[in-house]
């Protein structure tokens, strides 16, 4: 016998929804805004005994847009459930690693797969219009297109699986998507970076070249699973620093594979993960993976006890700024470069509610010229941190033909990051002269020091008050 609860959930005699999960547990997650199908799917995979793990899985579903209710109500050629049933025999020889690798590449692609889907649907609409103009009824056209699309998608999906299996092998002889012949940068099997919270620092020898040392510190982020040669090129432009590849699942509910190039110290990092469910849920919405970035930036807390001047490029909705705020690092001045007015509005609202420093907004990174950079440096006494991650639209996504590497329209903006960083370093070295050299020597000592934390201090020039705050570290 089934009884309808007050929340509209059918219960059996044992008080379980649909005979598989306690109705109270289902109602709890439905009240949080998750769809019924998503909740049942998560409980089916995890069981009904650990609500914490169920929530983690639901957050992951929501972050990657994997809502089973979408697939069940559509006959689209993109329906993964139909394809998985049809390809069951073909997948007999798959192992779990292949599945996980393909799942990561296909779904954790930072939203660029949405653009592929929209373009595919637009092309499908054009095909239907063409068939209607030839005299076919629209219903028949749709059925024909859906059937043909499903068959074609099955073939493409099968080809993609074979390609992914091949891609999991050494890639030294593959032709890069962007036409370059850069040697690939192999990704580590376990993306744990230089260290993990509550885990001792492994033996990492990181000798940064002199030109990579500050001022300022810099921090660059992008997707780890980029086309062949991309990270080699990025590393070459950023002073041949080897990236720190990190899988964010070690830090928060979202699962993202990222690469970071920076000249920060790697000793004495502190973990700052929000332990509450609400904190982890909010972290999913930030442009950077806040927990991961905060862990890396935590070394700056003792170096800049009086606050920082930050140049934030491609800021999104402020993941970097949120990370610094959570670390308790005062942001005296932030020059923000973000082209999206929606993102800018969200970040400005957050800033007004939480910060007391100065926020300067620039819409387009191309408008940040060397002349404007020099004006800012003279006005605020220099930048302590240049941080950002250029768009990954041409580096990730399910449609490999859109992956143009660093030659793509959006990903090519990386070169503006390098241009601006190089201008900041050159101008600051020219303005501050010997003081900049002193900073560089102390920075090098900090990076080489193997003992306890070192608080960085530099001498002050009483005759020059314009750069007093930013150089008093």
Swiss-Prot record:
One GO cellular component, as annotated: nucleus
Region (Disordered): 84-115
Annotated protein name in UniProt: DNA (cytosine-5)-methyltransferase DRM1A
A Pfam match: DNA_methylase
Domain UBA, residue spans: 20-61, 120-140
Family affiliation: Belongs to the class I-like SAM-binding methyltransferase superfamily. DRM-methyltransferase family.
PANTHER family given in the database record: DNA (CYTOSINE-5)-METHYLTRANSFERASE DRM2, DNA CYTOSINE-5- -METHYLTRANSFERASE 3-RELATED
The SAM-dependent MTase DRM-type domain, residue ranges: 204-431
GO annotation (BP), single: methylation
Species assigned in the record: Oryza sativa subsp. japonica
PROSITE patterns: SAM_MT_DRM
Role, per record: Involved in de novo DNA methylation. Involved in RNA-directed DNA methylation (RdDM).
Reactions accelerated catalytically: a 2'-deoxycytidine in DNA + S-adenosyl-L-methionine = a 5-methyl-2'-deoxycytidine in DNA + S-adenosyl-L-homocysteine + H(+)
GO molecular function, one term: DNA (cytosine-5-)-methyltransferase activity
Localisation per UniProt entry: Nucleus
């Amino acid at each position: 016998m089934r009884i309808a609860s007050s929340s509209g959930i059918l219960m059996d005699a044992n008080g379980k929804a649909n005979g598989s999960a306690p109705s109270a547990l289902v109602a709890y997650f439905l009240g949080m805004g998750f769809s019924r199908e998503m909740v049942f799917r998560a409980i089916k995979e995890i069981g009904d005994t650990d609500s914490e793990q169920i929530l983690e899985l639901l957050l992951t579903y929501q972050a990657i847009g994997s809502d089973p209710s979408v697939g069940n109500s559509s006959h689209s050629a993109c329906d993964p459930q139909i394809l998985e049933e049809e390809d069951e025999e073909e997948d007999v020889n798959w192992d779990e690693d292949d599945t996980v690798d393909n799942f990561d590449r296909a779904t954790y692609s930072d939203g660029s797969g949405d653009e592929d889907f929209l373009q595919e649907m637009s092309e499908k609409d054009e095909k239907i219009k063409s068939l209607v103009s030839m005299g076919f009824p629209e219903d028949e056209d749709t059925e024909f297109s859906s059937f043909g699309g499903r068959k074609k998608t099955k073939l493409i999906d099968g080809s993609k699986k074979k390609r992914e299996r091949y891609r999991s092998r050494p890639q030294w002889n593959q032709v890069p998507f962007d036409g370059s012949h850069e040697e690939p940068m192999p990704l580590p099997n376990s993306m744990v970076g230089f260290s993990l919270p509550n885990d001792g620092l492994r033996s990492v020898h990181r000798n940064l070249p002199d030109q990579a040392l500050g001022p300022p510190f810099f921090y660059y982020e992008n997707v780890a699973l980029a086309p062949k040669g991309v990270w080699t090129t990025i590393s070459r432009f950023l002073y041949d620093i080897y990236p720190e590849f990190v899988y964010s699942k070690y830090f928060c509910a979202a699962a993202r594979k990222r690469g970071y190039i920076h000249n920060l110290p790697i000793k004495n990092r502190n973990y700052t993960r929000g332990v509450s469910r609400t904190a982890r849920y909010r972290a999913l919405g930030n442009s950077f993976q806040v927990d991961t970035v905060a862990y890396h930036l935590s070394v700056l807390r003792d170096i800049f006890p009086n606050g920082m001047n930050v140049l934030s490029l491609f800021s999104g909705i402020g993941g970097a700024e949120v990370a610094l705020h959570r670390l308790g690092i005062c942001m005296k001045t932030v020059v923000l470069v973000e082209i999206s007015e929606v993102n800018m509005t969200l970040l400005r609202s957050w800033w007004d509610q939480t910060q007391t420093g100065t926020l300067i907004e620039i819409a387009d990174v191309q408008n940040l010229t060397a002349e404007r950079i020099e004006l800012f440096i003279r006005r605020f006494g220099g930048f302590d941190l240049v941080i950002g991650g250029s768009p990954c639209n041409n580096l990730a996504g399910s449609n490999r033909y859109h992956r143009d590497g660093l030659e793509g329209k959006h990903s090519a903006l990386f070169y503006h990051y390098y241009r601006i960083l190089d201008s900041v370093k050159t101008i600051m070295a020219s303005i501050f002269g010997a003081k900049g050299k002193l900073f560089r020597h102390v920075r090098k000592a900090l990076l080489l020091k193997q003992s306890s934390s070192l608080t960085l201090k530099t001498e002050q020039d009483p005759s020059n008050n314009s750069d007093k705050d930013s150089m008093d570290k």
